[in-house]
From Swiss-Prot:
The lineage of its organism: Bacteria, Pseudomonadati, Pseudomonadota, Gammaproteobacteria, Moraxellales. Its EC number is 2.1.1.-. It catalyses: L-lysyl-[protein] + 3 S-adenosyl-L-methionine = N(6),N(6),N(6)-trimethyl-L-lysyl-[protein] + 3 S-adenosyl-L-homocysteine + 3 H(+). Keywords: Cytoplasm, Methyltransferase, S-adenosyl-L-methionine, Transferase. This is Ribosomal protein L11 methyltransferase. It is an enzyme of class 2 (transferase). Methylates ribosomal protein L11. The gene is prmA. InterPro entries: Ribosomal_L11_MeTrfase_PrmA, Ribosomal_PrmA_MeTrfase, SAM-dependent_MTases_sf.
Amino acid sequence: MDWQQLHLQCAKQDVDLAESLLLEEGALSISLEDAGDQPLFEPLPGQSPLWDEVILTGLFTADTAQDIESMAQTLAAQVNARRVWTTALADTDWEREWMSHYVPIECTNNLWIVPKWMTPPNPDAVNIMMDPGLAFGTGYHATTRLCLDWLTDQDLSDKVIIDYGCGSGILGIAALLLGAKQVYSVDIDPQAVLATKQNAERNDVTHALEVYLPEDFAKAFAAGDIPKADIITANILAKPLMELAPYLATLIKPKGGIVLAGLISEQLEDMVRAYEPWFNLDTRHSYEKSDDHDDSHWHRLSGTFTG
């Protein structure tokens, strides 16, 4: 079965009305995307910021084809749309289409990230088998790669790691495969907790990885059930990272290592200032430009606990 798509470009204050009207007309799903080139870097937990100009796309069954043009004009007038247009969408195997976008990634020092349905290109490498669809941290984003590259340069033998803001669990899993003794993963999102557990099982590291929501982690740490870390990884965003600085300082051993990511160039100075009472940080590492993407605006900070 083929499909019809109706696209509306409108201001963000009209998005709620546009969504309601599309649903009333029988839209099976609605997607939102940026109508321009406006980045949204800092969504905090519970926030859902929108771009100033938004393109809404409603998906309809093919039997709406004869009515969709008139529907488009009516809806455009109701929501003051800047633009309105329709497109046909051929039916396809969406699961296979989604899977086709993921390929194995080679990181530094013989570390690979491999989608769970694929065979590792190098069976002798350190291969992390991941489900890219569960939570943030698939290895395809520059911030994750920056942390992974840092981990491969560390001596992780017999080390205890705390991965704060674990997402998919990829950093903790990588640490264990690279020789760490124990990982404690933490995330505010229950879906990330589930994803981490599933990915840990997929990589046979469940015996050495525990995952918590923040409040449960804090209780276990206060009770002495979780030791201080040799290394802390935190790939989040600038605002929560700055707020976490004094807390993370309580979780780490003397001279322990830390790596922070999810940062852009303009945020580095404030981040160093937030952490300098406890950590000596190196600001020199940004993601290198590749043939496909320029992600050089993403940076990591790494250093040593001095408090």
